[in-house]
Amino acid sequence: MTGTTLAATYGPISGADLEAELAQPRIADGDAQDAAVYERDGGARALPFASGGAPPDGDRADVRRAAGAGDASVRLTRVSKRYGERAVLADVDLSIGRGSFVSIVGRSGCGKSTLLRLVAELETPSAGTLVKRGDGGGALDTRIMYQEARLLPWKTVLQNVMLGLGRRAKDDARAVLDEVGLLARANDWPAQLSGGQRQRVALARALVHRPQLLLLDEPLGALDALTRIEMHALIERLWREHRFTALLVTHDVQEAVALADRVLLIEAGRIAFDQRVPLDRPRARASAAFAALEDRVLQRVLTGSDAAPAAPNAAGPEGASRGRAAPASGLRWAV
């Protein structure tokens, strides 16, 4: 993992780790020991907090981001990944526009999370090239969130967000907790929070670094339906305000269509389907256009062929094939 990548997660923290940490004498900067644990277990180096700037102007900014504004943040060229004799990804070509929101769907084991880990530089390609360009052509500061928040249980909510930043970052941490609606819980312990609240803290911990690329590996998979919808709205609002590039891996087709400018399907280690989502934000999930687009993506996942003509205002990219589709009848999951 490079110095510009933050896995917004902790590796397994055993009881021995906890006992050893509690037995350590407190030092001038009490966070230093925990930052070392964080780095050891797949954490990251802290970067200075930078102002997110003014939010973009409404839907016009979303259109520019969906098109990538001609500026790729991430580009993969003929990327393959093998584990021994098993090929997981094969000759993947992908360009992700700066400031866009891309979702990846597919059946279990198709290579979705492997692709995300390659982009995060937690894995290296077996073949091909991966190029990440930050603002001005520099390094692309990246954060990644997983399904488990993995907060340090002996740290308060505020201290978890501040981890690795030092005590002077307290104001920044409080500001981002306010953004995710948890400032009032800043001094609570992680055990006092619900699952959705813990994921909000994990999101705050990633956003306090003001990343240019946020990778989301099924971060909402363990939450109930209503909490997921609330988190969708929160992630979308923060994405529009902070203008980072987002790449989401999910089994939930409705979630993919609700959040993304573009939905990719991975089959047999390749990108088999690339569907633009030209729907206005916030997405009206009860609309015919949304339902038809969700159905089209789901049918493509389930049947391996592009289903019926897309709904009005939900056309796919040029060259996408079209056919008939049966209603998805409430099916949302591509497992």
Curated annotation (Swiss-Prot):
Signal sequence region: none
GO cellular component: plasma membrane
Primary location class: membrane
Compartments in which it is found: Cell inner membrane
Binding site residues for ATP: 106-113
Coiled-coil positions: none
Record's keyword terms, sorted: ATP-binding, Cell inner membrane, Cell membrane, Membrane, Nucleotide-binding, Translocase, Transport
EC number: 7.6.2.14
Disordered: annotated span: 308-335
PROSITE patterns: ABC_TRANSPORTER_1 (PS00211), ABC_TRANSPORTER_2 (PS50893), SSUB (PS51291)
InterPro entries the UniProt entry points to: AAA+_ATPase, ABC_transporter-like_ATP-bd, ABC_transporter-like_CS, ABC_transporter_ATP-bind, P-loop_NTPase
Membrane topology qualifier: Peripheral membrane protein
Reactions performed catalytically: ATP + H2O + aliphatic sulfonate-[sulfonate-binding protein]Side 1 = ADP + phosphate + aliphatic sulfonateSide 2 + [sulfonate-binding protein]Side 1
SUPFAM superfamilies per record: P-loop containing nucleoside triphosphate hydrolases
Record domain ABC transporter: where: 74-293
Pfam families named among the record's database cross-references: ABC_tran (PF00005)
Superkingdom: Bacteria
One Gene Ontology MF term: ATP binding
Family: Belongs to the ABC transporter superfamily. Aliphatic sulfonates importer (TC 3.A.1.17.2) family.
Function text: Part of the ABC transporter complex SsuABC involved in aliphatic sulfonates import. Responsible for energy coupling to the transport system.
Quaternary structure and interacting proteins, as annotated: The complex is composed of two ATP-binding proteins (SsuB), two transmembrane proteins (SsuC) and a solute-binding protein (SsuA).
Protein's recorded name: Aliphatic sulfonates import ATP-binding protein SsuB
Taxonomic source organism: Burkholderia mallei (strain ATCC 23344)
